[in-house]
Amino acid sequence: MIEVRKFSLERMIEMTQPIFLKPVLQDKIWGGRKLELEFGLKGPSDTVGEAWCISAHPNGVSIVTSPAEYAGLGLDQLYQEHPELFGNPSQIVFPLLIKILDAAAELSVQVHPDDAYGLEHEGELGKTECWYVISAEPGAKIVYGHKAQSRQEFEDLVASGRWSDLLVEVPVKAGDFFDVPAGTIHAIGAGVVILETQQSSDTTYRVYDYDRRDTQGNPRDLHLKQAADVTFYPDPERHLQVKTQQVGDSQVIQYLENEFFTVTKWEVVDSLTLSLDNAYTLATVIAGQGRLWLDGVAYDLNLASSFILPNGVSEIRLEGTLTLISSHPA
C-alpha cells in the first residue's frame, strides 16, 4: 500500500513538467533553407521542407529531450508506456501531428481522406488539418478549394489539365489561418511558411504536381481515383469562428475547434498566465523568445521550441515577447 501511494506521488510530480521534443526534419522536392536560416533547424540537405515538431507517426517520430527521465524516448513510446501523462486517453495512437513547412516551391495540388476512407484503404487515420501562416513572400498564394460542381466535372477538368478552371487560388499573408478539412483540394504556394496542425496521418492523394520529376528523374505518382473518391462536390464554403481574448497586452486567439482538435494562438507581450483544463496541450514557438514558468521553475523558450504540457498541468505563465501556436485533441 505504501509503495503504491509513493508511485502515484512520483507520477503526479512528473506530470507537472513540460515535455520538450526534438523535431524530425523531412527533405522535400519543394523544400528550401528557411527552416535552417530562420528557425535554426538544420537538416540533411538544402531542400528541407518539413519539421515534424510534435509527432508520434512512424514516418517521423519526435524524440523527447526533457525531462531527463524520458529523454531519448520517442513520443510514440512515451504515449504507449506512460498514458497517465496524457490523461489515460482512449485513442490507441497519438492523435495529432504538428509541423512547420517551408515551401520554397509549390506543393502538389492534393487532398486527404477522412477517417473512414483512410482506415479502409490506407490503414491509418484520415487527415484533417489547418494552417497558420508564419510568413509569406509578396504575391504568395495557396490553392484552397475547387470550382467543379460534380465528380464528373472534376474528373473532366483534371483529365484536360484545365487547372485555372478548376482550382481556387487565394493570396496569403503572415497571420492568416486556414481550416483544411479532409476532402479539401489544396496546395501551399511558393514562398509560404506555415505551422500545420493535423491528425496523425501521412496519407496524401496528389492531383497535379506541375509535371515535376523526383530525384531519379521519374514523374511523381498521382492518385487521381483516390482523390476523386474523397473530394467534396461541390466545394463547401468555410467560415472561421475566431474567438479573441485580450489579457493585458497579450492575446489568446482561438481559431478553430472541430471534432479532432482545438487550435489557439498565444500572443505574449511581457507576461501571460493561462489556465488549462484539457487532458494535455501541445505548443510550438513560431516567433520571439521567452520563458515558460511552471510550478516555480522557468524553462527557456526559443524559436521552434516545441513541448507538451501533460495531464495535471492546470496553470502556466509565459514571459517575454513571443508567439506560440497551441492545440489539444478534442
Predicted feature locations:
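An exposed, glycine/acidic-rich loop-and-rim segment of catalytic or binding clefts
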Residues: S160-L166, F177-D179, I185-H239
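Ligand-binding loop in jelly-roll beta-barrel domains
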Residues: V93, L101-E106, D115, L125, ...
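Short beta-strand/loop turn elements enriched in aromatics
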Residues: Y132-F154, V252-Y255, V268-A279
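Short, structured beta-strand/loop micro-motifs enriched in basic residues and often containing a Trp
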Residues: D156-S164, Q289-R291
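Acidic/His-leaning functional-site neighborhoods
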Residues: Q241-Y299, L303-S305
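Short acidic-glycine-tyrosine-enriched beta hairpin
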Residues: L166-D179, L294-V313
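Conserved hydrophobic/aromatic beta-strand scaffold that supports enzyme active sites
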Residues: I100, S108-Q110, C130-Y132, E169, ...
